[in-house]
Amino acid sequence: MPAASELERRTKRSKSRNKISKPIANMLSVIAFSICISPIVYFLIRSIYYLVFHPLSDYPGPKLWAISRIPWNYVNLQGDLAWRIRDMHLHYNSSVIRIAPDELSYTSSTALKKIDGTPPPREFLKCLDGRGIAPAVVNRRRSIVTETPERHTILRRALQPAFSERALRDQEDFFRDHTDRLIAQLRKPQYGVTEQNILRWFALLSFDIMSDLAFGQPAGCLDLVDEPWLGVIGSRVKSIVWYQFAVYYRIEWILKWIMPKAAMEARKRHQALTLQKVQRRIEEERSGKREGKKRDFMSYILGNDKENLSNMDLFGMASAFIVAGSNTTTYTMTAFTFFVCRDSEVYAKVIAEVRDKFASDTDITMVAAGDLPYLKACIEETMRLSPPTPSALPRWVLEGGEEIDGKWVPGGVTVGVHNLAACHVPWNWHRPLEFIPERWLQTKEGEFTHDDRALHARFLMVDIMSLTCFLSSMAMNEMRLALAKLFWNFDISLSRNSGNWWITQKSYLVWEKKPLMVTIKPRH
């Protein structure tokens, strides 16, 4: 009996514990379930808000892009953002689309003027959180690209003397000397036998010119037919989107794992060399050693230094000059060669104009090359069909909001004009996907009357790294002279495998620099 009583007591205690533990277990299950499902519920509620109640909910665009920035980042990392946004504008048949929960893309010249041309105090500030230029600060310093509006104004004033009419005239010797060196190299027998990567030759030319203009000393790229830093710049193009991704999600520490070590070390070497050259150039100016030498950018900047720029300011500007200037001209001249050589009629018109006007190579000067209307039209059409910066450099709408293209946009929204999309949509251009230089020669009513040339003009005035307003005239001078001399001296044809060069290009804020193989034969 005592044993039976003990068994009964144990049974009762066990049942009592089970009664207590069951609610606890149920409660823990509910908590676990809530923890697991709460992110899903949060995502669904947030998605409904973005799609139905958000101020941008009535703008056209893909729904998945409207509820998350993940699609934007994924496509950007693939190098397809410029092409995809162009396709979305065409798909929705709209000049404005929503490309992220808080971002709009426009294609009109009026939007471009509003976003990039509104003066202070309502100026749209550059978006530096990873959607545009990233990172904003390197080694605890901002560049001219990412400076505050106040500091940017100071740097612009300091740059103005270097881009005066007199300064542009003085640049003729720089352009002519290096262009003649390019022609001399291409005339060597070894370069007429095999196919040549014309993009590399244009890169060597542009890098030499920009280095000479920035430091008063050429880099010697054309003489050596090599420049290791060019390869570094090319490899770093793809890293731009990773910088954007890391900065946006505040995980910059991840960059050391995804960036090639060789590229990071080469970048550091280049920065050290650039700083050394800037310091040498400043010392030359102060000691009077530049007396009688050609005037470069630093001659004008240091000779009119009312802003008391530091060595680091000059270093930042010199680096930006070289990267922005060489990128724009290298890509545009390569694309020009592709589009012109792809169309036999256009090619025939270009060489006829150049060769009929000049009896000899020495007759081709910067001024004379500016008097080639068809060549100029081909450059303009190249920059329209394949703009050097195909994506947008977005800006913030200030608190209180702004009206853009007749519709109110709330503060805190990111807005921008994606250049490739704006240049390819049929409401801006007639026959937009065709290379037609004649559209720039039309002076009367005709087929291309309604082309939005104001849009193209604005592109030349606003940022390609915040320097285009200064560099556009210089770049046009360089391109007209170099292309006139090239097509006067040589017969050029695309290689058999170059037909898809343009349409297969990736973009990482700027275009990927894919080789363009051509055959170059001297005329005589």
Curated annotation (Swiss-Prot):
Alphabetical list of SUPFAM superfamilies matching this protein: Cytochrome P450 (SSF48264)
EC number: 1.-.-.-
Known cofactor(s): heme
Binding of heme, residues: 469
Keywords noted in UniProt: Heme, Iron, Membrane, Metal-binding, Monooxygenase, Oxidoreductase, Transmembrane, Transmembrane helix
Keyword hit for Acetylation: no
GO molecular function: heme binding; iron ion binding; monooxygenase activity; oxidoreductase activity, acting on paired donors, with incorporation or reduction of molecular oxygen
Pathway as given in its UniProt record: Secondary metabolite biosynthesis
Membrane-spanning intervals of the chain: 24-44
This protein's GO CC annotations: membrane
Record family assignment: Belongs to the cytochrome P450 family.
Protein's recorded name: Cytochrome P450 monooxygenase alt1
Organism: Alternaria solani
UniProt lineage: Eukaryota, Fungi, Dikarya, Ascomycota, Pezizomycotina
Gene this chain is encoded by: alt1
